[in-house]
Swiss-Prot record:
Superkingdom of origin: Eukaryota
Expression sites (tissue/organ): Liver specific. Hepatic expression is sexually dimorphic (female > male).
Top-level enzyme category: oxidoreductase
EC numbers on record: 1.14.14.26
UniProt name for this protein: 24-hydroxycholesterol 7-alpha-hydroxylase
Pathway(s) the chain acts in: Steroid metabolism; cholesterol degradation; Lipid metabolism; bile acid biosynthesis
GO biological process: one example: bile acid biosynthetic process
Cofactor(s) required for function per UniProt: heme
Pfam family, one: p450
Transmembrane domains' residue ranges: 3-23, 270-290
Family that this chain belongs to: Belongs to the cytochrome P450 family.
Source organism of the structure: Mus musculus
Length: 470
């Protein structure tokens, strides 16, 4: 082989590398400031993964309102001011579906083609079933389910607050949206289900990005839950009938099976996670904030007593009119969600977009952090304070939140179950504080800074002591 023959492939490789390097540098020059580390593919992932919430805010302070983080093979461009927010929520060049296809595949094994075929139809179905015109159908069943769980707590006790709200909301939600007694048939199966779902939920964010062989316990729990759905699909479909007598999951499966029967268990798992992952932590933070603020706690108790009386032994019914008289509780829930909002919402850039003086290239994940947006004093004065009264300014009668409140997403694809979640947490707070005298035995912990997806969990334990009112 001649020296020129040897030189040619080497030269081509070197020139190709130079072109790629120069292209990436040009991309970075035109685009926002980029934090990318030095390790291929991983990028800034090691530092970012330690405490992503803190990393995002430090980057914003250093680089300004638009910046990019390269981590785990992804370019994530964050925005924090009006122009960037408007692009994320309104631009035709960014897409929600493209942003979540890969995480949905990794966490539930739903292929992209199946997800694309069903996504808009299922979103419209859930939005209708759990929207403002239909939530009143859930008030009675949820109240009955919560009463049943409260009976099981007895007259007094001490529990971790997180376990307390899970004990109440997991069965109430499953029995209302899925099928009564579907999974939770006895103490052994209840304990196993709780443990498997907890493992799946806690590893969900990592499972959406990392190879499964790195997450063996999470992978086992995912397979266990999928097998549980596969075993019970027939029972779920046989429950109820068309219309409001059928459950939400039954209606979802009817739509899924117009496209495929193979992935019915997978969609069951997605709905399970969506139903159980965020409402319990919102209830945790709401009860925690109320009990940590004596004046607000007293106001809430006085409001409940003014509607239902002071005794705590009666099995009360809660009507739509009652809920309207107890706006203070909805304010407390929304203020808790404001303070403990998800770390990010995201869209995929499908065509380059201009934000301020930067061009964000196609392929980037465009991201906004509701957690930090809600701490901007320009939008929320005294942002770190728990001030339920700020929600007087929201037009909740017309289902309109405060400006720049993004806890449930924004734009076309907001959380379709947000009104159901608010309802079940309202009912939970009312029934707990009506029946029991409650107090916290530990300071309310800070939020975990390790996760960005969904409502943050507490970073530590917090016990609640409860005693039935005389």
């Amino acid at each position: 082989m001649g020296i020129m023959e040897l030189f040619s492939p080497i030269a081509i490789a070197v020139l190709g590398s130079c072109v790629l390097f120069l292209f990436s540098r040009l991309k970075n020059l035109l685009g926002p400031p980029c934090i990318q580390g030095w390790i291929p593919w991983i990028g800034a992932g090691l530092e970012f993964g330690k405490a992503p919430l803190e990393f995002i805010e430090k980057a914003r302070i250093k680089y300004g309102p638009v910046f990019t983080i390269f981590a785990m093979g992804n370019r994530m461009t964050f925005v924090s001011e009006e122009e960037g927010i408007n692009v994320l929520l309104k631009s035709e060049h960014v897409d929600f579906e493209s942003a979540v296809q890969s995480p949905v595949y990794h966490t539930a094994w739903i292929p992209k083609n199946v997800f694309s075929a069903l996504h808009e139809r299922l979103y419209a179905l859930m939005k209708g079933k759990m929207g403002t015109f239909n939530t009143h159908h859930f008030t009675g069943p949820l109240t009955e389910e919560l009463h049943e769980q409260l009976e099981g707590l007895g007259t007094h006790g001490t529990m971790d607050l997180n376990d307390f709200v899970r004990y109440l909301l997991y069965p109430a939600t499953l029995n209302t949206l899925f099928k009564k007694g579907l999974f939770l048939t006895d103490k052994r199966t209840i304990k196993e289900f709780y443990q498997q779902f907890k493992t799946y939920d806690e590893g969900f964010e990592y499972g959406s990005q990392l190879p499964e062989w790195l997450l063996r316990n999470w992978s086992k729990s995912k397979r266990w839950l999928l097998a549980l759905f596969e075993k019970n699909i027939g029972n779920i479909k046989a429950h109820g009938s068309a219309g409001h007598s059928g459950t939400l999951l039954q209606a979802i499966l009817e739509v899924v099976e117009t496209e495929t029967r193979q992935y019915s268990p997978n969609y069951g798992l997605v709905v399970l996670w969506a139903a159980l992952a965020n409402a319990p932590p919102i209830a945790f933070w709401t009860l925690g904030y109320i009990l940590s603020h004596p004046d607000i706690h007293r106001t809430v108790l006085e409001s409940i007593s003014s509607v239902f009386g002071t005794a705590g032994k009666d099995k009360i019914k809660v009507s739509e009119d009652d809920l309207k008289k107890l706006l203070i509780i909805k304010w407390c829930i929304l203020e808790s969600v404001r303070l403990r909002a998800p770390g990010v919402i995201t869209r995929k850039v499908v065509k380059p977009v201009k934000i301020l003086n930067h061009t964000v290239p196609s392929g980037d994940l465009l991201m906004l952090s509701p957690f930090w947006l809600h701490r901007n004093p320009k939008y929320f004065p005294e942002p770190e304070s728990f001030k339920p009264e700020r929600w007087k300014e929201a037009n909740l009668d017309k289902y309109i939140f405060l400006d720049y409140f993004m806890a449930f997403g924004g734009g076309k694809f907001q959380c379709p179950g947000r009104w159901f979640a608010l309802l079940e947490i309202q009912l939970c707070i009312i029934l707990v504080l009506y029946k029991y005298e409650c107090s916290l035995l530990d300071p309310l912990p800070k939020q975990s800074s390790r996760h960005l997806v969904g409502v943050p969990q507490p970073a530590g334990k917090c016990r609640i002591e409860y005693k039935q009112r005389a």
